[in-house]
């Protein structure tokens, strides 16, 4: 199924982006087929959707064009957007508001979108810089951890992104955004835990945390149980 999905992923994605360009529907690309390039074997990536942020005043127009392309809504995100799917299997998520409830997150995540720049091929659409794309993933992972909705695949995608690009990113920019979101300890802890999960001692990015292993045990329990067990060892996660 993953191989088959990969064959239609990029063509279906480009069909949507080209349609939005043709009818001048603006959008910011939050996640795309590029996630498959994080994996040594692209077919081992999840069958994840194209994710788009669309200004509220153009949202229903965009939604209508997706209906015309054969997409149907199979899940609503009340107050934020919806998940759509086509018979061939390709999925797209569209948002008119970013899916975060806290005031601080809304403010600073929106500022990431405001930094997006026009795509070279489809200039009516905007894309995130390398740093903003990483920050969106990290901030969303932290938010999902705090709301007990963090999936292992999401954490793996984040870790592979960091592993592949951390030397190319502007650390000063990342540190400033992490401080704004108040996720300094949580973001670092998620990366360290992912490193323990998804790497070997030989290719690990971080030293083994001998003195704080109980913290990672609690975090692991919380993720694997969707919050039914696992102490709040990180104060940031309780806010």
Regions found by a protein language model. Give the residues of each.
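Conserved NTP-donor binding/palm subdomain of two-metal-ion nucleotidyltransferases/polymerases, i.e.
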Residues: 1-48, 54-239
């Amino acid at each position: 199924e993953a191989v088959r999905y990969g064959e239609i992923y990029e063509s279906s994605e480009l069909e949507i982006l080209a349609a939005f360009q043709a009818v001048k529907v603006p959008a910011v690309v939050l996640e795309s087929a590029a996630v498959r390039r994080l994996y040594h074997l692209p077919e081992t990536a999840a069958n994840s959707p194209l994710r788009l942020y669309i200004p509220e005043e153009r949202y229903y127009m965009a939604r209508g064009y997706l209906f015309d392309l054969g997409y149907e809504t199979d899940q609503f995100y009340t107050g934020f957007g919806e998940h759509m799917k086509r018979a061939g299997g390709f999925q797209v998520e569209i948002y008119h508001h970013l899916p975060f409830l806290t005031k601080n997150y809304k403010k600073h995540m929106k500022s990431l979108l405001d930094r997006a720049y026009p795509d070279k091929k489809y200039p009516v659409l905007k894309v995130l810089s390398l740093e903003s794309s990483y920050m969106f993933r990290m901030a969303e992972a932290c938010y999902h951890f705090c709301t007990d909705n963090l999936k292992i695949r999401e954490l793996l995608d984040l870790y592979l992104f960091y592993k592949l690009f951390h030397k190319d990113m502007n650390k000063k920019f990342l540190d400033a955004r992490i401080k704004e979101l108040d996720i300094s300890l949580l973001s670092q802890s998620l990366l360290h835990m992912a490193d323990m999960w998804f790497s070997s001692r030989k290719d690990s990015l971080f030293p083994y945390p001998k003195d704080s292993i109980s913290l990672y045990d609690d975090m692991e329990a919380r993720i694997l149980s969707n919050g039914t067990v696992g102490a709040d060892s990180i104060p940031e996660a309780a806010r």
